Amino acid sequence: MIKYLQSHLEEQGYLFVTLPKPDLAPLQLLTEYKGHLEEYDGSLLDLFEPDGSPFPIRDRQLPNFSGQQLLQTDWSAGADLLHGLFKLFQQKEDKLKASLSGMKGLVLSFAYENIEEERVSEQALDNFLAGAMPKKEGFQRSVERLQDGELYVLTSVMRSNQFTVTIDCQREDQGKLEAAVAEIVDAHASIERKQSNSFSLQTEGEQAFVFACRAAQVLYNKKQWFQFWKKDKDGFRIEKREGMVVRGEEDFSVQPLQAPSGLLKL
């Protein structure tokens, strides 16, 4: 399981994506399963009749987050995350675990560069849902999840096209670590070595991946479910959800790190 420290992102209501993905976007649906959010087929607009006022998707640069260490893990989880990032960047990862395994106390810290946020107004979304009518076709498959409070919608995604990982270990393994990082860099032409124990990898062209997001729970304010198709003052709404993570079927589960008090927050 991945273990992570509380970060600036969590403090501002963002959720981590366990293995960064290129295809997440605002208004995409998620479903809750065993305390995690997972991808769910379709968009919110597939479930409701349009009201003639499209949601503008806005982009903004987030320089304050670029270069910050946003995620820190131990080796047992960091190896999986690094392995997933290498696959996303279409890099061979065969030497990755072999080069770094066996050292004691490995800690991996991840930073992302060139961060952009793609978002939709949560207020506009909530206003839309307050009077929205479900589509009779295609909505029924989601009714049960909605009744159980398991349906979520993405309101914001953070994208990056470059990451830097810094690896720390116990002092007696420092020489081995520097040699291992050199071996990894030598095996991958796209990797740039930053310091003795850190390296950076950037995607080619404009391709970017989503590593964090915001999500809101879709709720329904009506006592009787058979009144779904009647339009009155009651209706749908969203509620922000924090403290969860987003994963796909191939991802590993995530738990917060039980950190001692006074531990530095990243």
UniProtKB/Swiss-Prot annotation:
What are the start and end residues of every segment in region (C-terminal region)?
248-266
Q: Where are the transmembrane segments?
A: 65-81, 93-113, 162-181, 187-203
Q: Which domain of life is it from?
A: Bacteria
GO biological process: one example: defense response to virus
> Per UniProt, which keywords does this protein have?
Antiviral defense, Cell membrane, Cytoplasm, Membrane, Transmembrane, Transmembrane beta strand
- A GO CC term attached to the entry: plasma membrane
Identify the residue position(s) of the site Cleavage: 247-248
Domain comment (free text):
The N-terminus has marked structural similarity to the mammalian gasdermin N-terminal domain. The C-terminal region wraps around the twisted beta sheet core, probably stabilizing the inactive state. The beta-stranded transmembrane 'fingers' of the active protein form by local refolding of several alpha helices found only in the inactive state.
Q: Anything else of interest in the record?
A: Might be a Bacteriodetes scaffold.
Q: Which family does it belong to?
A: Belongs to the bacterial gasdermin family.
Q: What is this protein called?
A: Gasdermin bGSDM
- Species name for this entry? Unknown prokaryotic organism
Q: What is the lineage of its organism?
A: Bacteria, environmental samples
